[in-house]
Amino acid sequence: MRRVVGKRVLEFSEAEFDQLRSQYDEVVLDVGTGDGKHPYKVARQHPNQLVVALDADKTRMERMSAKAAAKPAKGGLPNLLYLWATAEKLPPLTGVGELHVLMPWGSLLRGILGSSPEMLRGLAAVCRPDAAFLVALNLHAWRPPVPEVGEHPEPTPETVDEGLAARYAQAGWQLTDCRYLAAEEVAALETSWTRRLNSSRDRFDVLALTGKINP
């Protein structure tokens, strides 16, 4: 595994991960973390959980990974790990109990929409039975449509069962709820997209999908 600590990239072995994992009750995995603010918030709020954040762009994680590695008095969080990796080629993680994919873009968006079943199955493979998932879709990807959405129409709570839920089920994901997020809920996600999205009562910009993996 390639651990990001500021501008440094350090090798992090499976044995080191297992030793760190043994100190916590649960593992939360944030895929496509971007600037890494969301996992920092989760790790700070849940010190009993090991939070693993990964992204294909290591430079975006530099600031928050350096902060997480600092002494606790300076904002350091020993339960937070930033990894340089992609969803297509995950590090050798096991026992993930909660999976977050927030505002996916590019190949990650394509995979989360079911165009890459291998990605969905790969994510399921690192999760324990009945792991929870949260996917937050930035609906601006359909306004106008970006190439990654392909032929998938903009999902809504009314239409999600017609296609996406079935594609998820084939990969071991059970979709149980789909709803629009209010502006304050979008802000609470603490992602780099938060400041760019302006949800309103007459135009919803973020759709949240929740459910279980390996039910």
From Swiss-Prot:
Residues the entry annotates as binding S-adenosyl-L-methionine: 32, 55, 87-88, 102-107, 191-193
Top-level EC class: transferase
Annotated catalysed reactions: adenosine(1408) in 16S rRNA + S-adenosyl-L-methionine = N(1)-methyladenosine(1408) in 16S rRNA + S-adenosyl-L-homocysteine + H(+)
InterPro entries: NpmA (IPR056262), SAM-dependent_MTases_sf (IPR029063)
Enzyme Commission code(s) on record: 2.1.1.180
Signal peptide boundaries: none
Note: Protects S.hindustanus, which is an antibiotic-producing bacterium, against self-intoxication.
Free-text function comment from the UniProt entry: Specifically methylates the N(1) position of adenine 1408 in 16S rRNA. Confers resistance to various aminoglycosides.
Protein name stated in the entry: 16S rRNA (adenine(1408)-N(1))-methyltransferase
Species the sequence originates in: Streptoalloteichus hindustanus
Name of the gene this protein is made from: kamB
